[in-house]
Amino acid sequence: MSEVGIDDIALHFPRLFFAMQDFAEFRGADYGKLNKGLGLEAMAIPDVHEDTATMGANAVSRLIDRNSLDPSSIGRIYLGTESALDGAKPTATYIMDMLEQRYSAKFGDNCFRNCDVVDMTFACIGAVDAMHNTLDWVARGGEKRHRVGIVVFADNAKYDLGSSGEYTQGAGGGAILIRHNPRLLAIPDIWGVSTMPVHDFFKPRREVETRTVVENVLELAEESGASITANLAERILKFIPRSSKKNDVLFENEKLMIHKDTPVFDGQFSNRCYSESVKQAFIDFRSKAIVEERYNPDEDEILTNQWSRIIVHLPCLLYTSDAADDT
C-alpha cells in the first residue's frame, strides 16, 4: 500500500500587521518575553475586505496554481476554523464559491460541483481533525483512484483589548494538499487521541434582554446630559409591539442572542489542559502502536527518542519534556 500524507502547503497572511515590538511599547509589555520566549514578531490584521473565507480561498488558490490542479480532481475541501462566517452553512462553501469564480473561465462553470466541503470546529485543532478525516478518505480510495483532498485552516483570532491573551491575536490561512506518495510528509495511520470536555476556552452565545438594551441606552442619554422623563423605559417597552421598529432585529424578541468573536478563557488552566492532553495522547499512541505490533517496549527505544521532531501547540512548549518523559 502506498503512503498518504502532505504533498504541499500554501499560506496566506493579510498584509496589514502590528509589529510586536510596537505592541509591547504600547502595552508596556516585555518584548523579550513575547519575541524570544514565544517567538512572536508581528500580529497580522485582516483588512476591511478580508475574513476567514478570503484568507482560506487565497491559500487554496495558491496551492491549485502551484500544483497545476484541475478543480474537478479535488474531491474535498475541509476547513478547520473557529471563525466561521455562518451559523448554518460551512464557511468552506464561501471559499468554494470564490474559487469557482476564479477558475470557471478556464475549467468551466461548476468546476467544483462534485467537491465535498465542510467545516470542523475544535478551537485551535479543527484543522487537525479535518486532516485526519481527509487522510483516511484518500487512503480508503487506494492509489489507483488517486483521490486528492485539500485541508484548509483559516482564522481571525481576536481577544478583548487589554486582555491577557491580546498579544496572541492574529489572522491568516493555509491549505494542505493531501494525496498518495506525498513529497513532504507521509503520515502513518496510528493516531494518539486525547479529548477532555473542559471549559478553559470557549465562545458562548450570550443572552441579553431587550429591556436591558433600552435601559442602557437611556442611561447613556442621561450621562450625555439629555433630559429623560420618568418611566420612559417602561413606556418604550410597552410601545414596541405597535411601533414601526417591532420587526427590527433588536426588538423582534424579548431577548437577544449575542455572539462575540472574542473568547472567554483561563490561560493558566488552558496550559494545564494542554499539558495533560499531550501526555495522554502520547500514551494512547504508544498503546495503539503496541497493539498493532509496531512498537515493542521491551526491545525498542522509547518512541520519543525515535523521533527527530515533536511539534506541539505553542503553550505546550515548556511542558513537552515532562509529558514525553512519562510516556
Stretch-by-stretch model annotation:
Residues 1-49, 166-283, 289:
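Condensing-enzyme catalytic core mediating Claisen C-C bond formation in acyl metabolism
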Residues 44, 78, 111-129, 162-166, ...:
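Cysteine-centered functional microenvironments
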Residues 59-74, 281-306:
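Phosphate/pyrophosphate-binding loops at sites that engage ATP/ADP/AMP, CoA/4′-phosphopantetheine
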Residues 71-95:
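Membrane helical hairpin/interfacial module
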Residues 75-78, 145-155:
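A short, small-residue-rich loop immediately preceding and capping a beta-strand
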Residues 90-105, 135-140, 165-170:
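A glycine- and small-aliphatic-rich helix-loop capping segment at beta-alpha/alpha-beta transitions
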Residues 118-146, 155, 160, 168-169, ...:
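Active-site-proximal alpha-helical scaffold in enzymes
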Residues 319-326:
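Conserved small/polar residues in nucleotide/adenosyl-binding loops
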